[in-house]
């Protein structure tokens, strides 16, 4: 039997003091899904301001919903959106399924939308945290959502974006603070120097990842040193994709600064962990390697998903 999916749509125009943002929303009947298209300019992609997200709603809604915004990794290999051609990764697909079961609205953000980005284009990735903040500020005005219970999570590249919330540069761009964040398998080789913030955090790492543990161990200690409440959990015997069949392969990865990570400071300067000043160009040269991870059987991915949702449940109050 052929399935017919019906869409309804409407437009919003949001004005600020010197600009406007056209927001288009499409509702997918019978799927408890909405899609939103909005603008988040990135200087790396002039004229390609559109970003989209797919919002998954619980079947039964009682009161205002807590919201998880999910940022995909470099490979959007898990789920194609119902409209507009957006995609997310496999962990995002499972987070959406588990999250709505637990009563969350789960927002799958596609920050690569129509930008022609391939997983190997590490130097061209957008500053996706900006899109997440724009989206949060939009959704915070929607009366269906509890603007005091917004959570941010991501995998790999997305996990690195989530950790940027500990930078004072990005933390100050939302009217109400994020409740908590989860960074699943971030690289931690190039990070923001953190400030002390109220956001609760969890870093999940595979012990056999090609994004080797020492980098995230160092950054976790730094986050705690400045006063943040952040946990680090490792899953034994699994690689970057939470698989048990992991090996080291060939492909671009930001893992060349494992033992001396690069930090960006609030004033825009860069230093390595040992205090040596550096530049963006040197960081790119030293930190990007051709040593990637292989193996996507994902036997332990559901464990990482459960860790994520359980952590948010703990702080969902």
Please provide the spans of the model-predicted regions.
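Short substrate-entry loop that stabilizes the transition state in hydrolases
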Residues: 61-65, 70-117, 209-213
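Alpha/beta-hydrolase active-site loop
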Residues: 91, 95, 121-143, 164
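A conserved short beta-strand
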Residues: 172-187
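Short beta-strand/loop motif that positions the catalytic acidic residue
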Residues: 197, 203-205
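C-terminal catalytic histidine-bearing segment of alpha/beta-hydrolase fold enzymes
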Residues: 229-317
